[in-house]
Amino acid sequence: EDGLRYLQGDLGSMSLFDAVAGGRNAGGRYNQREKELLVRTIRQLPNIQIRGARGLDWQNCYPQPEFDEDSVLFDLNYFKYCFLKPSELDFHELKLEANFRLFAKDLTSEKTDSFLYRDFQARNIMLDPNNNPYFIDFQGGRKGPYYYDLASFLWQASARYSNKLRRDLVAEYYDALKQYTEVPSVRHFVGRLSLFVLFRTLQ
């Protein structure tokens, strides 16, 4: 009750990243077992995002408590200075900054009480002997939109997921999300998700 003690378990050494290496190395041709692991994982994501956020003191999140316009602009400027400028592509800097500000406003326009994992990738998911997923490494976690983690997971470049597999996993996530919170229409959900896919791609 004093919050000074906790139970710790050994999850072993099998990560989801290692468990689906065959499909990744085959250029995105995942077998049925690997797809089932991905489905099981993506259906567990809303559990930590919604149920895990209940009662959480956001002020304990480090380095900041909430996904906001400043954090979006920080990442977008990283893209500008580390990719655009070194590439020597010609662009109008003031117009780009204006677009960045509008984009940041769009991304943060819907307020939610969900936990944004921030680094939700296969390397940060461990599997127990029964192939149940356990999520590790919460550094950078904060209050924020649930679309972010879904985009992070399904559009990580190294995974090589096919468009069909992505669509199937988005549908699985959407279905699982209904168990934890009221969900927007499919059209609205997909539209919002596309914004975060673009944002994660720029990162």
Residue map of PLM features:
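ATP-binding pocket architecture of kinase catalytic cores
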Residues: 1-73
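Active-site-adjacent scaffolding segments
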Residues: 9, 65, 69, 76-79, ...
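Amphipathic, non-membrane alpha-helical segments in soluble helical-bundle scaffolds
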Residues: 35, 69, 140, 163, ...
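Active-site acidic catalytic loop and adjacent metal/ATP-binding pocket
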Residues: 48-49, 102-148, 160-161
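An alpha-helical support segment within catalytic cores of ATP-dependent transferases
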Residues: 53-65, 70-71, 75-115, 181
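Glycan-recognition and catalytic cores of secretory/periplasmic carbohydrate-active enzymes
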Residues: 54-58, 62, 66, 73, ...
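All-alpha amphipathic helical-bundle segments outside canonical DNA-binding/catalytic cores
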Residues: 64-67, 184-197
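Active-site activation/catalytic loop segments of kinase-like enzymes and analogous catalytic loops
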Residues: 77-86, 146-182, 198-203
